[in-house]
UniProtKB/Swiss-Prot annotation:
One of its GO terms (biological process) is regulation of DNA-templated transcription. SUPFAM superfamilies: YebC-like. It is found in: Cytoplasm. GO terms for cellular component: cytosol. Signal peptide: none annotated. The keyword Transmembrane helix does not apply. It comes from Clostridium botulinum (strain Kyoto / Type A2). Belongs to the TACO1 family. Its main location: cytoplasm. Pfam families: TACO1_YebC_N, Transcrip_reg. This is Probable transcriptional regulatory protein CLM_3478. GO terms for molecular function: DNA binding. Keywords: Cytoplasm, DNA-binding, Transcription, Transcription regulation.
Amino acid sequence: MSGHSKWHNIQAKKGKVDAKRGKIFTKIGKEIVVAVKQGGPSADSNPRLRDVIAKAKANNMPNDTIERSIKKASGELNAVDYETITYEGYGPAGIAVLVDVLTDNKNRSAGNVRYAFTKQGGNLGSTGCVSFMFQSKGQIVIEKKDGLDEDELMMMALDAGAEDFESEDEVYAVTTSQEDFGTVREALEAEGLEFLEAEIKMVPDTYTAIDEETATKFQKMLDVLEDDDDVQNVYHNAEFPEGWEE
């Protein structure tokens, strides 16, 4: 599988982050609210909060912004209650898609997600229609830089408990079990490494190759979903064409 195909979304996001940084921070802030409500404001005793903080740092969210979000969440006893929902369905050409939302209005979210699917020739499905094609895994993505030795990094990751290590185009990708994600992430952080991504994700068992026409339609669908304030994550099994650019 080509590096561009598998890691297309990561590479594409790098160019969009500045334009959408405020929206990304808002979404992560919602995740912090949910994590604090579930397990309290201390990252030491709240694994979910630790994971969200790692995601925030990978997205260059400033530490003071993270801390303000935690304090705000812990102080708002009457804060908005967000509901976590995962929608499943098919994009153009039958691409399997999972959409995670955090919402205070599930009717609004359902309508918006359904519109994004149908606009590009896809459709929402019933619960379980595609989730069996994915596994929950930890993924840590590190940008290739001068002075970062691939073999040393691989041994570091595997010794810490990683399941897999890949070198793809401009990045190294470390995959872990959901259970070992925190341990591996902390081991790499202790070595001074910075991450492009560090989070628990739904990873497809296999990828489906799509042509350029389908890739263009699907990217439009992804853009609509990712622009929705309620949508936190979008996972899919599409393998984009080699050399394709939106």
